[in-house]
Amino acid sequence: QTPHGPRFGAEPPVEFAVRMRQFPHEARLDRCLQGGRLGVENTRQLAQSIAGFHMTLPPRLDSDPDFEVERAVRPARNNFKHLDPQVFGDEAQQRLAVIEAWTLAQASALAPVFEARARSGAVRECHGDLHLENLLMLDGRFVPYDAIEFNPNLRWIDIANDIAFLAMDLLARGHSNLSFTLLGAWLEANGDYDSLEVMRFYLVDRSMVRAVVSARRAGQAVETTAGSARPGAERYIQIAADLVDTPTPRLILMHGFSGSGKTWLSNRLVPGVPALRVRSDLERKRPQAGTGVKSKTEGVGLGRYRADEIDRTYGRLADHCRTGLQAGFNMIADATFLQKRHRQWFVDLARSLGSQCWLLDCTAPEEVLRDRIRRRAETRDDASDADQAVLEHQLSHYDPVTEAEGMTVVTLQHDSDPDQVLQDILERRNIN
């Protein structure tokens, strides 16, 4: 072999510089979605995988916060420079005008938030192009590929921006249930509920990015304005318009003793309402994240079950719900809510924001509760630390819910059919 006459693959390799593996196209997540192989449960696993990936990335703490703000808002502003409204129909033109006005207003209003998130380490070297076509399901795990390499400004972004692209892609494909499942599980895994302040901005931005890409493919961009509007671009414009024009969100409280099925039901409500969820079982442990201290039940009145710690947990849940509601997301607070004063915090919160407050009262006979707690302790497959002692304390120390508390109360039995429960909540009870 010579430089002028190289031969490839003629001899056994001595060492690989780069060894690539060809993947089956059916492994792409867009194909999995089309084939019905991407559902709620593995979307939760996908979200947890992405959250884990984001948490391993070193934050960028040495850049100018003003530059980070500009990096967040400039692409969103520029989207509208690359679209000529005249090539779209009248309705799409009106939507574009509304979206642009909203984007400019939000870019200004959120500038302090973008700066604060940059200072807190939310800006990291992310994937940058995280949508379904750039994700694989291989050998039971999720594998991202084709990350952005050519432009550092497109990959050094807020982790909320990274996940927003995938959530928007699911919305665009008509799967709002999976989109909210993804966002909800991502938030529960990393605890970054503050990201909800900017999440809608990034969802709209990512939708407009895809509108620009679709327009360019159809010859609709400013550079080549000839051609009629392509449905793809208008579809993304419609999605962005829907994200901008959100109805008043609702606050849903799960209520009941440990083992009554609150989390089981809220797992189904997240994609069904749809809504985002905060769980007391996760939030009470959040301060210990990364300390290496193994989670364990410390007993009634001790550790995380001290009265002041319980108040702190409910306060954290309320803060997260406030952030989500103010950002236009339906929120579910999954906790026992056995004390009237804790319920009142959330009723007052909803009232202050003009939101409805619903309480879903999950009930079960005491023997069923005790059996579930026993089986949970044996399997150890639940985030709850509640044991028999905690349950017995709850059964003797609770404030019954009354109509005077100002909530819409729905009582649910432990043996209710899950599909019927969801239909009752969403349709007859008119939550959605």
Name these PLM-found stretches.
Residues A289, K296-D308, R351-V401:
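A glycine- and Lys/Arg-enriched "phosphate-lid" helix/loop adjacent to the NTP-binding pocket
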Residues V270-F329:
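Conserved substrate/cofactor phosphate-moiety recognition/catalytic segment
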